[in-house]
């Protein structure tokens, strides 16, 4: 099973988060509407409605930023998104300085911010 990793840059904290067409194709199976997200470990059961806008270039819209802002994500943290069996996408944040962040940060070189990796790379996340 693959997960999508998205490294956060300053712009992502104030604007919509960009995504590539390749990620949309390979990870989201070209689905851009009616995406349902949940926060990993969230017990209130809230489901966030997300879309992928494509006015100039693809960007997450809808309630996407609300998900990771509740976790107080910041520049340099990495979003981890995986698809659950029920079709929802589960989002968690790998915070800088944590074991999981240290394990996965090496997949990004320079200003790269998108990666799809095998979930086995994450270990017991």
Where are these regions (language model features)?
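Acidic, low-complexity intrinsically disordered regions
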Residues: 1-125
């Amino acid at each position: 099973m693959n997960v999508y990793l998205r490294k956060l840059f300053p712009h992502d904290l104030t604007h919509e988060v960009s995504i590539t067409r390749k990620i949309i194709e390979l990870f989201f199976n070209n689905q851009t509407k009616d995406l349902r997200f949940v926060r990993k470990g969230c017990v209130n059961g809230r489901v966030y409605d997300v879309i992928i806008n494509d006015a100039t270039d693809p960007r997450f819209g809808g309630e996407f930023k609300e998900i990771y802002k509740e976790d107080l994500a910041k520049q340099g943290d990495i979003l981890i998104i995986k698809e659950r069996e029920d079709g929802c996408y589960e989002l968690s944040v790998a915070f800088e300085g944590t074991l999981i962040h240290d394990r996965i940060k090496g997949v990004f070189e320079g200003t790269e911010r998108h990666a799809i990796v095998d979930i086995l790379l994450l270990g017991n996340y």
